Amino acid sequence: MGRSISVSFGLLVVFLSLSGTGADQDCLPGWSFYEGHCYKVFNVKKTWEDAEKFCQKQSNGKHLATIEWLGKANFVAELVTLMKLETHVWIGLRVEDKRQQCSSHWTDGSAVSYENVVHNTKCFGLDQKTGYRTWVALRCELAYHFICMSRVPRGA
């Protein structure tokens, strides 16, 4: 009986250590799972456009991260904070029309249903000064770190 409890406890420790790493949700190594998607913050700086292209090249279905509700915003903020970056971080939102209005869609095509915008400019990133919890308008041609997101493959 004592040995059975010891083995069960050992398996529980292994399971808990893998939670959040993506290992138990079929995310690639280094990616983190949340609500059906995998996320990764890249410790390299790129312009908004180059960051989006980089995300797309990682695999089909990958884009700069979309933030569609507060729970996801908090998850992404914590993930970015763990990287201990000292700069803004690109997300997948940018102005796409001449009236300087926000696009109604994220880079992955999903509708914008949650907004946390401070100012209206062309590209948006997470503001380091607020612990990555608010969006800040940034010049698209500046290079910042970025966070990519992908759907977990169906049937995985």
Swiss-Prot record:
Residues 34-149 form the C-type lectin domain. The keyword Phosphoprotein does not apply. InterPro entries: C-type_lectin-like, C-type_lectin-like/link_sf, CTDL_fold, Snaclec. Gene3D superfamilies: Mannose-Binding Protein A, subunit A. SUPFAM superfamilies: C-type lectin-like (SSF56436). GO terms for molecular function: toxin activity. GO terms for cellular component: extracellular region. Its main location: secreted. Keywords: Disulfide bond, Hemostasis impairing toxin, Secreted, Signal, Toxin. It comes from the Eukaryota. It is found in: Secreted. Disulfide bonds join 27-38, 55-148, 123-140. Expressed by the venom gland. Residues 1-23 form the signal peptide. Shows greater sequence similarity to the alpha than beta subunits compared to other heterodimer snaclecs. Interferes with one step of hemostasis (modulation of platelet aggregation, or coagulation cascade, for example). Heterodimer; disulfide-linked. PANTHER family: PROTEIN CBG13490 (PTHR22991:SF40). Belongs to the snaclec family. This is Snaclec A12.
